[in-house]
Design a protein with these regions (language model features):
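A short core secondary-structure module
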Residues: 149, 153-199
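Glycine-rich beta->alpha junctions and the first turn(s) of the following alpha-helix
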Residues: 5-7, 196-279, 301-325, 395
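C-terminal helix-coil-helix/basic helical segment that borders enzyme active sites and/or dimer interfaces
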Residues: 28-35, 324-380
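A short, Trp-centered hydrophobic/proline-enriched beta-strand micro-motif
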Residues: 119-127, 171
Length: 418
């Protein structure tokens, strides 16, 4: 298929591009991991919602535009190209929202999706526990039957957005006698409810994007159960498919980063090679990489003339090519889904690819910057690479470790024995 499918290259893309150019605030943007920054991003989400651009692929009744999956990818391309703010509502918009559309009741959809789209309710994930991370089926937090609902007890950890979010969704054990993949229930609950304690987790960069959630007999009504008790695992795997596959890691994120990386290479290393550099042109008219053809034996910055410079230029090129390859893969997956296909174990393949690509992009950028990256400050243009690198390191761990994903690939895609 072509890199830019026709449905994703029409008037909607142009409309989104024009709106984003007119409305995206100049950077640097506040950190989403502080109370003030969190509310700043909530206000941005509300601006998107007012333009009906916060959940473009959702039904119009819930604040969306009913656009195709390919048009959604086009919007994501433009969003990242415009250097727009981080989506503070991503857990709801990209994970819980699609889960409710696929498995929730009509009452739940009507009650929960509109405030989610407007950022009136921002959601946290409540999956991992101190003794159950990628092995999600090992969870111990329990849901016990009560009159009209359930009582939740236990601990969740590494809950993204939980420090400042309004509500959370997650998996709990409702039948301790059942096999570990059974007896699970998918529940939603308020982080302001009686019995809930949230303790922020400070990260490498100083932010608190994750938190622990302590639950002490927290009441959740039956209306906030997704699906049936005992069927939680199947529904959770639907959510995980969105996290590992299309929804959280749209290709626009990586193509935009790859373009920034090539620009950084020209600004730092490429400057040393100006006298002898040859410029090539990349696919679809995109500017390619300047060749590292400096004077032999001349010392220069990382990536400059000589063998070391050639190696760095190769890494930049490899990352750029990988970002384009992921883009093609994702558009292909979207076309297959649009034709009635499903997102299965291949989501694990995509998760391994994008998480390792993210690390490669940021590692290469830091090598180009050298010590400057450590003193630039996280809020500056070069500091974005350091902050991005610290977060990218978690990519092979969250959403199911890459070791787990490779096991899924081996068993379910390749048919290898356990």
């Amino acid at each position: 298929m072509s890199e830019e499918p026709e449905p994703a290259a029409g008037t909607f893309r142009a409309e989104a591009r024009d709106w984003l150019r007119a409305h995206v605030p100049a950077g640097p943007h506040p950190s989403v991991d502080t109370a003030e920054g969190f509310e700043w991003h909530r206000a941005w989400e509300r601006e998107l919602a007012a333009a009906r651009l916060s959940v473009v692929s959702w039904p119009a009744a819930y604040g969306g535009r009913d656009v195709s999956l390919l048009d959604w990818l086009a919007f994501e391309d433009e969003y990242y190209a415009a250097a727009a703010p981080v989506r503070v509502g991503q857990n709801g918009i990209f994970l819980l929202g699609p889960t409710l559309l696929g498995h929730g009741s009509s009452e739940q959809q009507a009650r929960l999706l509109p405030p989610m789209a407007r950022a009136d309710e921002i959601w946290a994930q409540a999956w991992s526990e101190p003794d159950a991370g990628s092995d999600l089926a090992a969870i111990r937090a329990r849901a016990e039957r009560a009159d009209g609902g359930w009582l939740l007890s236990g601990t969740k950890t590494w809950s993204s957005r939980a420090a400042f979010a309004d509500k959370a969704f997650g998996l709990f054990r409702c039948d301790p006698q059942a096999q570990r993949h059974r007896g699970l229930i998918y529940l939603m609950f308020s982080l302001r409810a009686d019995g809930v304690t949230v303790r922020p987790i400070r990260q490498l960069g100083g932010g608190t994007g994750f938190a622990e959630i302590f639950l002490d007999e927290v009441f959740v009504p039956d209306a906030d159960v997704i699906g049936e008790p005992g069927d939680g695992w199947r529904i959770a795997m639907s959510t995980a498919g969105h996290e590992r596959g299309l929804s959280l890691r749209s290709p626009g994120r990586f193509t935009a980063a790859a373009e920034r990386l090539t620009g950084l290479w020209r600004r730092t290393a490429g400057a040393a090679d100006t006298a002898g550099a040859a410029c090539t042109t990349g696919p679809a008219g995109t500017a390619g990489l300047a060749g590292p053809a400096g004077a032999a034996g001349t010392a220069g910055p990382v990536g400059g003339a000589g063998p070391a410079g050639t190696a760095t230029a190769d890494r930049v090129a490899d990352a750029w090519i990988a970002a384009r390859a992921y883009r093609l893969h994702t558009y292909g997956t979207a076309a297959r889904l649009a034709a009635g296909g499903t997102l299965g174990a291949e989501a694990s393949l995509g998760k391994v690819f994008w998480s390792e690509l993210d690390v490669a992009l940021h590692e290469t950028a830091l090598d180009l910057l050298g010590p400057q990256a450590e003193i630039a400050g996280l809020d500056g243009p070069d500091g974005r690479w350091l902050g991005g690198y610290l977060f990218a390191l978690a990519g092979p761990i969250y959403a199911g470790t890459n070791e787990i994903q490779r096991t899924v690939i081996a068993e379910r895609l390749l048919g290898l024995p356990r």
